[in-house]
Structure formats: C-alpha cells, structure tokens
Amino acid sequence: MIKSELVQRIAEHNPHLYQRDVENIVNAILEEIVAALARGDRVELRGFGAFSVKHRPARAGRNPRTGAHVPVDQKSVPFFKTGKEMRERLNRDHPDPGAAD
C-alpha cells in the first residue's frame, strides 16, 4: 500500500472528512515523525510501534566488483520496532506457514 491508497482508505472509512483533509493530516503526522527523529527523539505509538534513530559507525567496506576497499562514513538510520499488539495481531491473523499443524 502506498500513501495515496492509505489516504483513500481512511477517507472511505470516514465519509465526513474530505480526502484532501485526510491527506493533509497524514502528511502532518509523517512530517512530525521525521522532525522528531531528526531532533534525536524517539516516537512511540502505543500498540503500533516505536520509531528511533540508530547510529552506524564508520567502517571499511569493499567494492564487490573490483574488490577495492572503500571507507564508509558513519551514518544515522531510521529504525522501527513493532509494538506488542501489532506483533500479536499479525501472528494471530497470519500463523507461521512452517509450523506443524
């Protein structure tokens, strides 16, 4: 699902809201999450999950084509950890196909 499909679904489930308003709300929520992460804050949505930033140290990489060693700078990457309720719902709705019956 892409963002426009999410906006459309929310608008369909909430006919009292205009689709443009839903789009503005979704954009505002996503922008606030990004801004909080950029400030170094953790964003927790109870039952859904938590967004945070992980810091990866600089390291020595390798070009797979040439084999040459390449320095890789340190960087910050977004990280999402699912909440307990989400994990339980996903596992309840989609049991492990490899598990014995």
Curated annotation (Swiss-Prot):
One record GO biological process: regulation of translation
Disulfide bonding pattern of the chain: none
Superkingdom in the source lineage: Bacteria
GO CC, alphabetical: chromosome; cytosol
Bias (Basic and acidic residues) ranges: 82-101
Any Pfam family matching the protein: Bac_DNA_binding
Gene Ontology MF, one: DNA binding
Keywords: DNA recombination, DNA-binding, Transcription, Transcription regulation, Translation regulation
Region of interest called Disordered, as start-end residue ranges on this chain: 57-101
SUPFAM superfamilies named among the record's database cross-references: IHF-like DNA-binding proteins (SSF47729)
Signal peptide residues on this chain, from the entry's feature table: none
Functional note: This protein is one of the two subunits of integration host factor, a specific DNA-binding protein that functions in genetic recombination as well as in transcriptional and translational control.
Subunit record text: Heterodimer of an alpha and a beta chain.
Family the UniProt entry places it in: Belongs to the bacterial histone-like protein family.
HAMAP family reported in the protein's UniProt record: IHF_beta
PANTHER family the record matches: DNA-BINDING PROTEIN HU (PTHR33175), INTEGRATION HOST FACTOR SUBUNIT BETA (PTHR33175:SF5)
UniProt-recorded name of the protein: Integration host factor subunit beta
Organism: Bradyrhizobium diazoefficiens (strain JCM 10833 / BCRC 13528 / IAM 13628 / NBRC 14792 / USDA 110)
GN (gene name): ihfB
